[in-house]
Amino acid sequence: ASWTDVGDAVRERVPEFFDIVSIFGSPQIRHVGTIGGNIVNASPIADSIPFLMVMDAVLAIAGPHGKDRMLNINDFYLGYRKTALQPGEILTTVLFPVPTANQQLSLYKVSRRRDLDISTFTAALLLTIENETIQEARIALGAVGPTVIRVKKTEAFLKGKPFSESVMQAAGELAVDEVTPISDVRGSADFRWQLVRNVFFKFFWERRSAAAKIA
């Protein structure tokens, strides 16, 4: 599916992902570029991968012997630009659920320009929150390692904790210890470490601001 097709499919059901899709490349690129290409390119700054990782997307992979195999995207990346695709295999389908009512999803992309620019940092945070308690956390960060990564220790720390500023601050510090950013033309390692911290604050205060408006 082209990026335009993906945008049409998720516009109403996953508006957070639509916002990312809508600024991917240029209109010309979105008409011909595909989400499958973004996935198998295996770039640590790929825009679609953080979202797909926190949604536990499943990839259908076709091989030369006529039988598809299914693989969770979190098991697809083996290293920098390395995937689990075997010789003769191609990615044919990407399956992912829609966030449920009690799942809070935010997607972030930091770049020098809003449109038509390569990411300096990407992130996806999906928290299941019930009665102000975090029941589950899934967090994927891009441009802070050789692949987009799930910060598993941070996810485990958040489970069962109250959804509070202090808890999210502590989670940000834990996440910093799980990433290994480099310095390049788009940003320094220190800048990316700070972005990791900031994204947890941003997620929290987005929710508090929205709750205040409703009240």
Stretch-by-stretch model annotation:
Residues 1-215:
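C-terminal structural segment of proteins
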